[in-house]
Amino acid sequence: MSEPTTTPVVGNSASGDSAEQHDLGQKRGKGGNWNRPRGDHQAKKQKMDRRGDRQREQEKQGEGRDTRRKTDGPLVADEVRQPKRKVACMIGYCGTGYHGMQLNPPQKTIEGDIFQAFVKAGAISQNNADDPKKSAFMRAARTDKGVHAAGNVISLKMIIEDENIVEKINSHLPEQLRVWGVSRTNKAFECRKLCSSRVYEYLMPTYSFLNPRPGTVMSEKLLKDGTSPDEEGKKYWESVAADLESQGVSYDEWMKRACIDEIKGEETKEVAESEVKTDSKTDAATLEKIKAVERRHREEFRISGERLAKIREILKIYEGTHNFHNFTLGKAFKDPSAMRTMKSLTCSDPFLIDGTEWVSIKIHGQSFMLHQIRKMISMVALSVRCNADPQKLIPQTFEKARINIPKAPALGLLLERPVYDSYNKKLQGEFGREGVHFDNWNDQIEAFKHKFIYDKIYAEEKGQHVFHAFFSFVDVFTGDASFDFLLKQGITKECTTDYMNKKAKEEGKEIKKLEEDDDEVANEQNEG
């Protein structure tokens, strides 16, 4: 693009004006401005005359026409204007069936449904119904496709004269999307910018922390590296082998066919079926028997106190301010925005849901980048499964070397709530208002979480075995040295992305991508 001209313009920029100014003998004064003799109003008068002529011509041409400013939606001339107040709107939702939080026509999104409900309930006037920006519409945290939120916040200017406005809004929403309440704020409130921190929850079955299955690529690498399964993992896999043998499936047959189902699965597209040696006449009945036995043992697994303590130990290493460039996409080590502060990370005691044991991990941080939470969870689980040294490995991920950390399934992730500690102190102190929080609706939120979020997560895992497919993919991956950082030496040059990409290029091989940023879109907050 060429540079714009720097010639100053006074009045109309037509060439006639320039010639007239030249005739008047105007010259540039200090600062490059044009000097016009005081008292000479001829140029100004001509300019005003021309402006009047244009205005009269436009009025003449516009007779009988609606000359109001055009918008995407109709202007409602007879709509009674009602006062709008700046508010924080507390919401919760199950993200199943939605293409994320953020408005993204023509896709079905949380914001799209909520905004339409606001309009139908009269919380937003018809004249402002065509564009959320007219109401200063903003979200505290954007969640991606399929991700849930027990609590999220929207700030906007809204009509709240009706004391039943929340009930009216909810009457226009599906059951999986709720408005908990509305709180008055000051005019300058912006829910994203004034959010002090955010709390996320990640649910996962405890069998996710088991050692890799014997005979898999990862298991063989660990054995060669001198890392044996822990006692709990050893006993678990021995019991699976004994159960299979009692049903006529030998250990060798199990090893031969163990990876076939995962290789065919959608979660493991990176591994070609030809990479596993198996007979062309694979016994489908035997495969089904193996899957059924493994599934039953996963459901019956109960995590030990020792393994649970290790999970909690690793989570604590994340606390504080660190460079999380390895836990997102496309973020350079030197990028200041890669520095993030984690306030606390905790793991619940295990609990049973429909016979399967689960744990809940809570992550409280100031802000998060794209995929960050899912990659953090993945690193915790992989470290436990492979008996890695977390005190060595996790700090290495905060350093310059770039590695591929696979992201754990989106299934278990939900936004619990944004936190407004600093803003609430100011709001209560200066304005005497209650503040922005979810305390008034705790019972409703808990009931909603169990019915519309937790139960859907549990049911999807039981039916589709999402976590099993993810960790099986890691166990059978043969593409390159991507996961060799889980061995005793930790992160070495050979398992960095720069080294592997350079080597693949030199050998004329296709560079394998472990993940694509296909279902999530980078955004202004980069949440989750």
Swiss-Prot record:
The active site is at D144 (nucleophile). GO terms for molecular function: metal ion binding; pseudouridine synthase activity; RNA binding; snRNA pseudouridine synthase activity; tRNA pseudouridine synthase activity. Residues 49-80, 505-515 have a biased composition (Basic and acidic residues). Residues 516-528 have a biased composition (Acidic residues). Residues 1-80, 505-528 are annotated as: Disordered. Its EC number is 5.4.99.-. GO terms for biological process: mRNA processing; mRNA pseudouridine synthesis; snRNA pseudouridine synthesis; tRNA pseudouridine synthesis. One of its GO terms (cellular component) is nucleus. It catalyses: a uridine in tRNA = a pseudouridine in tRNA; uridine in snRNA = pseudouridine in snRNA; a uridine in mRNA = a pseudouridine in mRNA. Residues 1-18 have a biased composition (Polar residues). Coiled coil: none annotated. The keyword rRNA-binding does not apply. It holds the Pfam family PseudoU_synth_1. Formation of pseudouridine at positions 27 and 28 in the anticodon stem and loop of transfer RNAs; at positions 34 and 36 of intron-containing precursor tRNA(Ile) and at position 35 in the intron-containing tRNA(Tyr). Catalyzes pseudouridylation at position 44 in U2 snRNA. Also catalyzes pseudouridylation of mRNAs. This is tRNA pseudouridine synthase 1.
